[in-house]
Swiss-Prot record:
The lineage of its organism: Bacteria, Bacillati, Actinomycetota, Actinomycetes, Micrococcales. Coiled coil: none annotated. This is Glutamyl-tRNA(Gln) amidotransferase subunit A. Disulfide bonds: none annotated. The gene is gatA. GO terms for cellular component: glutamyl-tRNA(Gln) amidotransferase complex. SUPFAM superfamilies: Amidase signature (AS) enzymes (SSF75304).
Length: 515
């Protein structure tokens, strides 16, 4: 008996296409897994349930009638709650949007539906994607499937946890400064931030519009490539959308899984992203991965990107400045929460103030205040203007590095998953958790995080980040898949096969969810 929740999305797609399983069976298996473990993990804010089963049954009916369907038809998928869905609440992890049902789908959600994937539900996240631990969700934290007392990363901890807990084979996330790649690192999953503009942002509730990017979360590099192919492409509804014709990321991943894929590839190790403050086990697994790459024919080159030293400081001026503008739309007048003032006249201004005070959490308020200050008269040039100059220097550092190497690598995060509360009241410690991922967002280049082992001191996942030049996303998939193959040969299988069993009472196979 095969547990369908343990299969990759590619394997599920093959079984569905061959008629060996139905989409209803695959969907029911994952809904069963959610029911069994999500009370502990809390990856989901909303589960589609019967709607997902109806969608799956409709796809099965069309397949049975002989209709030609896409390669991913019938495969379940989870969706980060930052993305608008016209049939499920879209809260962005905030009380101010509790219960809000958008009148439209985000473009990436529409593309999922057009490709006949089956949405399982919406995943938890830090409020308005502001955080690195999912502790800032208004609906409670998500827990790391490797250790339920530790964080799953953020802001997209729900999507990463859903995938690594085998509640979904695939998920969509968003990445503003590492919100896909950092959760992937600490949960043992794969996450990709595409080139800025490569995937539509229309319908993604904006945090920082010049930094946000939607991307795939999965358990394998190939699965990420397959989902990337579904969501990529130009969208006239997004003014920042690129008109590029993108190659198949899945084909790039398949090419990387072949022998010789790493021969003569130049891999740059960024000196500034592998220094003090990095956990010993993270550095050890990173160095071991470099050894595997070199042993397979890659050339390892140390490169310097001096401006990366200022990336965190610049990011935490640019992001709050843009967020303070984007979040001004939550005014209680047109949609979302509305709170009347406790006393005094009920005016639009006072209702807005009362609503924002009740509806926004402390981290969101902190960043709105910081961003408003950075944009204020007399401080704009000193803070926001200077941060944008640093951003330009970082882009130049990337350009110079990519003249010497094909990809850049670093640890995806400086540490493994930390315990709940450990950094919650120390904003700087929390912000520094994104030190390796932020530069790619500031420059708009693509980045991939993939698991490279468990840290010896705590037995928790460690991730490696790959970065490529803008528009060269396919390069990440080729090199990422090649490294994944080398690592799994060394481990004797996927890293997530070593993850703890979350539910002793869960039936691993049932009449509805096994073949």
């Amino acid at each position: 008996m095969t547990d369908l929740t343990r299969l990759s999305a590619a394997a599920l797609a093959d079984l569905l296409a061959a008629g060996e399983i139905s989409s209803v069976e695959a969907t029911r298996a994952h809904l069963g897994r959610i029911e069994a473990v999500d009370a502990d993990v809390h990856a989901f804010l909303h589960v589609a349930g019967e709607k997902a089963l109806r969608t799956a049954a409709e796809i099965d009916g069309r397949r049975a009638s002989g209709e030609k369907l896409g390669p991913f038809a019938g495969v379940p998928v989870a969706i980060k709650d930052v993305l608008a869905t016209n049939d499920m609440p879209s809260t962005s992890g905030s009380k101010i949007l509790e219960g809000w049902l958008p009148p439209y789908d985000a473009t990436v959600v529409r593309k999922l539906r057009e490709a006949d994937l089956v949405p399982l539900g919406k995943t938890n996240m830090d409020e308005f994607a502001m955080g690195s631990s999912t502790e800032h969700s208004a609906y409670g934290p998500t827990r790391n499937p490797w250790d339920l007392e530790r964080i799953p990363g953020g802001s997209g901890g729900g999507s990463a946890a859903a995938v690594s807990a085998f509640e979904a084979p695939l998920a969509l996330g968003s990445d503003t400064g590492g919100s896909i790649r950092q959760p992937a690192a600490v949960t043992g999953s794969v996450g990709v931030k595409p080139t800025y503009g490569g995937v539509s942002r229309y319908g993604a509730i904006a945090l920082a519009s010049s930094l946000d990017q939607v991307g795939p979360v999965s358990r394998t590099v190939l699965d990420a490539g397959l989902l990337h192919d579904v969501i990529a492409g130009h969208d006239a509804l997004d003014s920042t959308s690129l008109t590029d014709v993108w190659p198949s990321m899945a084909d790039a991943a398949r090419a990387g899984a072949r022998e010789g894929a790493l021969r003569r590839v130049r891999v740059g190790v960024v000196r500034e992203l592998n220094g003090e403050g990095f956990q010993a086990g993270v550095k050890q697994r990173f160095e071991e991965s470099l050894g595997l790459l070199e042993g397979a024919g890659a050339e390892i080159v140390e490169v310097s990107a001096p401006s990366f030293e200022y990336a965190v400081a610049a990011y935490y001026l640019i992001l709050p400045a843009e967020a303070s503008s984007n979040l001004a739309r939550f005014d209680s007048v047109r949609f979302g929460l509305q709170v009347d003032p406790a006393e005094g006249p009920v005016t639009v201004e006072r209702v807005m103030a009362a609503t924002r005070d009740a509806g926004f959490g402390p981290e969101v308020k902190r960043r709105i205040i910081l961003g408003t200050y950075a944009l204020s008269a007399g401080y704009y040039d000193a803070y926001y203007g200077s941060a944008q100059k640093v951003r330009t220097l970082i882009q130049r550092d990337f350009s110079a590095a990519f003249e010497r190497v094909d990809v850049l690598v670093s640890p995806s995060a400086p540490t493994t998953a930390f315990r709940f509360g450990e950094k919650l009241h120390d904003p700087m410690a929390m912000y520094l958790n994104d030190i390796t991922t932020i530069p790619a967002n500031l420059a708009g280049v693509p980045g991939m995080g993939l698991p490279i082992g468990l840290a010896p001191e705590d037995g928790l996942p460690v991730g490696l980040q790959l970065m490529a030049p803008a528009h060269a996303d396919a390069r990440l998939y080729t090199i990422g898949a090649a490294l994944e193959r080398l690592l799994e040969e060394k481990w004797g299988g996927p890293l997530l096969a070593q993850a703890p069993d979350l539910s002793a009472t869960e039936m691993l196979a049932s009449e509805e969810g096994a073949v």
